[in-house]
UniProtKB/Swiss-Prot annotation:
The active site is at 2 (schiff-base intermediate with dna), 3 (proton donor), 53 (proton donor), 253 (proton donor). The gene is nei. This is Endonuclease 8. Keywords: DNA damage, DNA repair, DNA-binding, Glycosidase, Hydrolase, Lyase, Metal-binding, Multifunctional enzyme, Zinc, Zinc-finger. NCBIfam families: PRK10445.1 (NF007763). Involved in base excision repair of DNA damaged by oxidation or by mutagenic agents. Acts as a DNA glycosylase that recognizes and removes damaged bases. Has a preference for oxidized pyrimidines, such as thymine glycol, 5,6-dihydrouracil and 5,6-dihydrothymine. Has AP (apurinic/apyrimidinic) lyase activity and introduces nicks in the DNA strand. Cleaves the DNA backbone by beta-delta elimination to generate a single-strand break at the site of the removed base with both 3'- and 5'-phosphates. It catalyses: 2'-deoxyribonucleotide-(2'-deoxyribose 5'-phosphate)-2'-deoxyribonucleotide-DNA = a 3'-end 2'-deoxyribonucleotide-(2,3-dehydro-2,3-deoxyribose 5'-phosphate)-DNA + a 5'-end 5'-phospho-2'-deoxyribonucleoside-DNA + H(+).
Length: 263
């Protein structure tokens, strides 16, 4: 499943296709969204924001399209006039003079006003996005030490979108390897140096993955252009200490680590 870097890269591709261009045609599959087709025609997409695995498509008239891909949703970009070859079910089509963006198979789609955006249940639950350039290590450290999160094992915490949005399994194992910790640790048990290292890694590793394009390789391994240190490398030698990378299951997800240098 794609994580924050892949979601942000997808948003970048959508923005590159239609941002700042008048919408010449708008179509929604769901009846409750049909009234917005005429309201959005002629408007501009001003930006596309990511909040974890949700996309917020902001329009020049103040409305925002909320969409969450869940397991099966996918966005596509095509040239205007092109007929896509797919068996997926179309949910959203936003068209400009030269490009069209299409959302297939997703079911969690809403149109929100500015006021509704501030009170949306998912957006209220989700934590700050690790790819938000405004988020600092100091703020991450404060969240780690907050009463809500300080007693949580990292094995589960680093998958919890209410802690930090955009984290997922490959980021979890790479972050913990980077700071030399296992998934059983809790923030309340770390010393100052460990807390500082983890606070930085929680931002640095996702941002590194994003800047290395956060894409999938030909085998659809998400994040494959980001060079993994331990993820999917069980049985290989750890590049830091030479120990053998192991694999187990933590919080119902595959977990990779070096038992020799992660303590």
């Amino acid at each position: 499943m794609p994580e924050g870097p892949e979601i942000r890269r997808a948003a970048d591709n959508l923005e590159a296709a239609i941002k700042g261009k008048p919408l010449t045609d708008v179509w929604f599959a769901f009846a409750q969204l049909k009234p917005y087709e005429s309201q959005l025609t002629g408007q501009l997409v001003t930006r596309i924001e990511t909040r974890g695995k949700a996309l917020l498509t902001h329009f020049s008239n103040g409305l925002t399209l909320y969409s969450h891909n869940q397991l099966y949703g996918v966005w596509r970009v095509i040239d205007t006039g092109e007929i896509p070859q797919t068996t997926r079910i179309l949910r959203v089509r936003l068209q400009t003079a030269d490009k069209i963006i299409l959302l297939y198979s997703a079911s969690d789609i809403e149109m929100l006003t500015a006021e509704q955006l501030m009170t949306h249940p998912f957006l209220q639950r989700v934590g700050p996005d690790v790819l938000d350039a405004r988020l600092t290590p100091e703020e991450v450290k404060a969240r780690l030490l907050s009463p809500r999160f300080r007693n949580r094992q990292f094995s589960g915490l680093l998958l919890d979108q209410s802690f930090l949005a955009g984290l997922g399994n490959y980021l979890r194992v790479e972050i913990l390897w980077q700071v030399g910790l296992t998934g059983q640790h809790k923030a309340k048990d770390l010393n100052e140096a460990q807390l500082n290292a983890l606070s930085h890694a929680l931002l640095d590793i996702p941002r590194l993955s994003y800047t290395t394009r956060g894409q999938a390789d030909e085998n659809k391994h998400h994040g494959a252009l980001f060079r993994f240190k331990v993820f999917h490398r069980d049985g290989e030698a750890c590049e830091r200490c030479g120990g053998i990378i192991e694999k187990t299951t933590l919080s119902s997800r595959p977990f990779y680590w070096c038992a020799h240098c992660q303590k």
